[in-house]
A protein has these predicted regions:
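S-adenosylmethionine/decaboxylated-SAM
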Residues: 2-200
Length: 200
């Protein structure tokens, strides 16, 4: 199937990380937190199809933020549902991330990726809420280890501070990319859960 994520509004530069995760897994459960209009979700879904993998994908977004600076995009949930329609293996979940975590059994997820709120406090809560849900040998990652484009300093370094505190140096960084407008995206991070991991 030809990729069409380029035609969807949004921010997305972690293609390499997603390709790597699909390549590593089969008969697996993936979760994406922060879907917006489905740009990254649809890229991941096409990769799953093209690599002929049996992977179920849950896409989680509360769309609570549409009441503030994103209010002009109130159609985001409907656009998202339309964009994922070709993929029978995607399950949309319209819940807050911390509430959605309660829907999953411990050690049931092979890979989870966050692109949600970027404050240190929220990132800490989110990682701790979801970490028990990840299988031993599974992966947890997220976008914007540093969020260069955010005007509020607490969101620029919030995710990175949380990841450093929880995982120390036990994670890998994927460099961010520059978009066509010259905006540099922050790097993404990826941690592999092992028995000796700090939390879980």
């Amino acid at each position: 199937m030809k990729h069409f994520y380029q035609d969807i509004q949004g921010w997305f530069d972690f293609q390499d990380l997603y390709k790597e995760m699909v390549k590593k897994h089969d008969n697996a459960k993936f979760v994406e937190v922060g879907a917006w209009k489905g740009k990254s979700t649809c890229f991941l879904a096409v990769e799953i199809l093209n690599q002929k993998k049996k992977i179920k994908l849950d896409a989680i977004d509360s769309y609570e933020y549409l009441t503030d600076e994103f209010s002009y995009n109130k159609d985001a949930p409907d656009v998202f549902k339309k964009n994922i329609k070709p993929f029978k293996f995607i399950k949309p979940i319209f819940k807050n991330s911390l509430k959605a975590a309660k829907l999953y059994k411990n050690k049931s997820i092979d890979f989870i990726f966050f692109d949600s709120e970027h404050s240190e406090e929220y990132a800490m809560k989110e990682i701790k809420a979801w970490y028990p849900k990840v299988k031993i040998g599974g992966y947890m990652g997220g976008h914007d280890y540093v969020c260069f484009v955010h005007p509020d300093p607490k969101y620029v370094i919030g995710v990175g501070k949380a990841v450093n505190k929880i995982f120390d140096n036990n994670f890998k960084l994927y460099p961010g990319k520059t978009d066509k407008n010259g905006n540099l995206y922050g790097p993404s991070w990826l941690h592999k859960k092992r028995k000796e991991s700090i939390i879980g």
